[in-house]
Amino acid sequence: MTNALFQPIQLGNIELKNRIVMPPMTRSRATQPGNSANDMMAAYYAQRASAGLIIAEGTQISPMGQGYAWTPGIYSDEQIAGWKKVTDAVHEKEGVIFAQLWHVGRVTHPDNIGGEQPISSSALKAENVKVFIDNGTDEPGFVDVVEPREMTKEDIKAVVEQYRQAALNAIEAGFDGIELHAANGYLINQFIDSEANNRNDEYGGSIENRLRFLGEVVEAMVEAIGADRVGVRLAPFTSLNGTVDATPVETYTAAAALLNLYKIVYLHIAEVDWDDAPETPKTFKSAVRNAYQGVLIYAGKYDSERGEKAVAEGVTDMVGFGRPFVANPDLPARIQNGYPLAAHDPNTLFGGAEKGLIDYPEYAG
């Protein structure tokens, strides 16, 4: 029997060689000053180009969009040139790579955004959330986030425009497409989830209103670069970074239906993945399948067996394997051949240099 993970699949105008996705993972190794992607990052992604699709780590669309020290941006000429090194290296290995466009909203600290106050849907501080800043050492310094200010309508318009420009910048940098990060408690998620949004204008209250900002951003990016190059990531059931929705099934089924109207090329659902996390309800997965007609990606707690089963049963079209890709640059070959997986070193995930980024070997037998 052929493993369903190794069937090719059409993603817009691109044929992908398999259904294995390297999902976005922050590694905090951008060149300083300037937060630019670099040769080391190019080597890292090129090593993993056997994935059907690579979604690069979140890249902030503006200086205000940065939540953590040393993450890459995509708003300056220097940053576009840095990412071009990455996309060229991946394309040389016949890989396909999308950029993940990121604005953290309230999940930051003034030290990461030039001393400014963070912005969000509402002036609600994310409770019990820390981010890391550059404290002058090689180790990230963790600090509590601060209360944001509520975005004005002018702020909203400006950020929609920043997303549009970032999408254009990503194509200029050689990316095959972009993924809008609307998950994990960051800015767009702060509008979507009821408990993070207490606005009383057209961007708050009802599900339709809370999805309005998402729709405006997607519409701007689709107009700029085409729907066949735009994907979106959602996280319906996570409470990461302090965002919670009171009715996640209803909210996120409506989000899937909205995104279907824009004919985006894929919808990427991040499932809760801590050790004893509950399973995503099957009823929700089938509701999403019915609401959204494009390529579906699920990521979170998948091993090769579970991933293959999900694709074979039609629950999803592609599967993201996050942490396994850190220590296994040749993950598709290891899955296909039943080779053992290496474990990653958690101490080298964020910050630092080559160690823990590009020194994990391929399987040697």
Where do the protein language model's features map onto the residues?
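Flavin-dependent oxidoreductase catalytic cores
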Residues: 1-365
